[in-house]
């Protein structure tokens, strides 16, 4: 199998791995930006730590690293359009994305999306280059949880809502 063919097969296989949709944001002296990401997972709960993978060619990397802090906003099922904005699918400029009325600053000064299922603010503790991506290890310092909403996942290169079934009365 050729390298390009293997890469495409791998990408097709990963498209079968359903993943939560997140917008990873940062703000500080290096600027303000954000990116839609599905390569996000917990590392440990003691201390709370998360891993975020971003393509090494992304223009966001110098901003994330320069600020040293970020927020992982776990999107709800009604925030697909915002995911599309931050994935660059709509042509909306970066600053315009943050001019929407749904943003507030968290305790660490990071952009937190109102209505997201969770907002995890943290400090970047380590950055590793692995192949085509940078892997950020993030020490979580502040957690904002919402009790409302259903999930949003990316599966087979499309967004899908994940709805909780209503529990039957006992």
UniProtKB/Swiss-Prot annotation:
MF terms (GO), sorted A to Z: flavin reductase (NADH) activity; FMN binding; NAD binding; oxidoreductase activity, acting on NAD(P)H; riboflavin reductase (NADPH) activity
Catalytic reaction annotation: a reduced flavin + NAD(+) = an oxidized flavin + NADH + 2 H(+)
Pfam (any one): Flavin_Reduct
InterPro entries registered for this protein in UniProt: Flavin_Rdtase-like_dom (IPR002563), HPA_mOase_red (IPR011982), NADH-dep_flavin_reductase (IPR050268), Split_barrel_FMN-bd (IPR012349)
Gene3D superfamilies cross-referenced by the UniProt entry: Electron Transport, Fmn-binding Protein, Chain A
Uppermost EC category: oxidoreductase
EC number(s) recorded for this UniProt protein: 1.5.1.36
Function field: Catalyzes the reduction of free flavins (FMN, FAD and riboflavin) by NADH. Subsequently, the reduced flavins diffuse to the large HpaB component or to other electron acceptors such as cytochrome c and Fe(3+) ion.
Family assignment from sequence similarity: Belongs to the non-flavoprotein flavin reductase family. HpaC subfamily.
Name this protein carries in UniProt: 4-hydroxyphenylacetate 3-monooxygenase reductase component
